[in-house]
């Protein structure tokens, strides 16, 4: 029986029954739980993206996912600030208007001037003029200056006449070895100057260097004097290819042969120019004539001169994938293949005793007979990503193909069957993810392959099983040449370095700053003269020799 004298139990006060001062103190504490949780979620997402295995082989996807996680965090915080802070309506309105004004003000002051190979945006002041716009007026009087005598028919062993050098494989033979210590004997600046936009390299014959560039609303093929950087002639055509992620201007590198220049523009115009004046000898609209669409990032195929033919990748259907023209007259000789193009260039090779033209297309690597274009063999190359690196013939019957975007590389065996027909099979059990060049090329030296792994590091790959011997350094999405027993590596940031080409260890010997800004263009080495460029500036350096 209850004691009637006992006091009734005290009931816990409800939140609304708390004194107003206590409720006011409790509300801010609860209010900050959500933004703290949102920030924790954002941090967790970024941590997962940076460490999950899916992104280990693709830095660009990793960066995009990181930016997405940060963007989602900011949006959630903004949503909370506007709708759930408990602030008066007027204060929330001011917060919204202030945030929009801040973003609009920021966007009115800066613009995205391209991205790195890993999709890191480059921000510049909106009023900053573009490099090609500053140069547009300088090319108004295109053509050969009256006092210039230009002869591209005189060749030498020092020439670098096409994409990736004399043999189109990134290997440069020098008569005298390069000095290995640039701190003691630095490269000499011959000239350094602005240039129009584009990702073309230089082709060099004798004292002349030819490249392609964008100047204002015109796509140009330009001839410079190697010793001075003086513009000798220019051929300009209306046209302007531009993509935010891929940049603007031409992508391919001209080919010099027999005193003429063969150049393919980003929109598919193939020109044969007189090397003495830059005047048009013949021209073709490769895309229109072959019913082919342009590529997302523009035509990047550097024309291959093979005997009397000029060969380019058109990418058209119904036998119009690869096209060959008579290099003298421009008449079409043959067209063959059905594969859409990608971003590589034709390469002549001899495999299994048969001379053939190799081309990496969007879905396959294909070999064509140079005489008539007939497809000799085809190997499907996985993935829907851009295929940029050149195939690398190895020995008598093997070829290495490679790609970035998390795909890696594969070694193929090319064999002739009893009927003489060629076929390709995999020499490794699976694709090697130890080397994933995105839009750079690899070089072969004494049975080992060297290349840049998806913007992360330089890699030496053993060809027996596709295993990595070493990795080192950081060169971004740069480019590479083999010079004797040295790797000349150009970084994405514009540095040029020398690295020993040995499977024993990674060892960078020396480096210097050659250019400023994003540098995707391939370097050209003609004798002791190194010509480099990017979308804003070009330079020529005299390298010291041993």
Regions found by a protein language model. Give the residues of each.
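Aromatic (tryptophan-biased) beta-strands that constitute blades/sheets of beta-rich domains
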Residues: 126-195, 220-243, 279-292, 331-336, ...
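Conserved blade-register residue in beta-propeller folds
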Residues: 221-223, 272, 322-324, 367, ...
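Internal/C-terminal transmembrane anchor helices
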Residues: 89-114
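Blade-level signature of beta-propeller repeat domains, shared across WD40, Kelch, NHL, RCC1
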Residues: 407, 518-546
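Membrane-embedded alpha-helical segments of integral membrane proteins
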Residues: 36-86
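Loop/turn-rich, solvent-exposed surfaces of beta-rich toroidal or solenoidal domains
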Residues: 407, 432-501
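Extracytoplasmic beta-rich repeat domains
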Residues: 184-186, 190-205, 215-218, 234-255, ...
